[in-house]
Design a protein with these regions (language model features):
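Bacterial N-terminal signal peptides that target proteins for export
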Residues: 1-7
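C-terminal motif of bacterial Sec signal peptides marking the signal peptidase cleavage site
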Residues: 17-18
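A short glycine-rich, aromatic-capped structural motif
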Residues: 26-99, 122-126, 202-203
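Functional-site microenvironments in short loops/helix caps that host divalent-cation chemistry
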Residues: 34, 40-50, 103-216
Length: 216
């Protein structure tokens, strides 16, 4: 169910224990509630015309506890604040290049002009993990990320099974041609949100997850 995404950003989760209706109502508006229960994880490719990667096999059922997940990708503005509070470790968290949505000016990290509400990109896994801890949250597991993206009806894309277009997802855009216009603000493209209301689960930037992948 993957659509090509560029670079690395992050979203975060909070896990709930003993979830109740009151807990569902008492969290920030910028997070969405993902209920407990099973979902079908993975995607089986039966021919070359289908979406997906071979490493998405085998299809299997996973049961998750309830959790909250960020509705939006982390912005360049918010990540710059984190870096400024951890400047000694910042080089381990991100490498500032002309293709990154933040810059380092006069001893301070800041979002590039006009990109304040765009997703942070080119973040290392260590930077993503440290930022989540700084916020009192954590990275989602791959299973948590996929359920938040696809829901429980085995859809191919966050919005359903319809072919991707640029009203739903940053589709077939190249940084070499478009520069930062390859991305969109984190709260844009509402037609492409997931069943739970999470934005840009199939576009903008890649997101890190907590667990690691063994191709062997």
């Amino acid at each position: 169910m993957k659509v090509v995404k560029i670079l690395y950003g992050l979203m975060m989760v909070l896990v709930l224990f003993g979830c109740s209706t009151s807990l569902q109502k008492n969290f920030p508006e910028d997070m969405v509630f993902i209920p407990e229960g099973p979902f079908t994880m993975g995607y089986a490719i039966e021919n070359n015309n289908e979406w997906g990667d071979m490493d998405e096999d085998p299809v299997h059922e996973v049961t998750l506890s309830p959790y909250w997940m960020d509705k939006y990708e982390v912005t360049s503005s918010d990540f710059a604040k984190f870096l400024n509070s951890n400047q000694g470790a910042a080089p381990r968290f991100i490498e500032i290049t002309p293709s990154v949505t933040i810059e380092y000016v006069e001893g301070k990290y800041q979002p590039r002009t006009g990109l304040e509400n765009f997703p942070i990109n080119r973040v290392s896994w260590y930077g993503a993990d440290a930022y989540c801890q700084w916020q009192g949250k954590r990275l989602p597991t791959e299973a948590e990320w996929e359920k938040a993206a696809r829901g429980t009806d085995q859809r191919i894309f966050p919005w359903g099974d319809e072919f991707p277009d640029n009203s739903r997802v940053t589709f077939r855009r190249k940084f070499s041609n478009l520069g930062f216009n390859v991305m969109e603000p984190v709260d844009s493209m509402r037609r492409g949100v997931s069943p739970y209301g999470v934005h840009h689960m199939a576009g903008n930037v890649w997101e890190w997850v907590a667990d690691w992948f063994d191709g062997g």
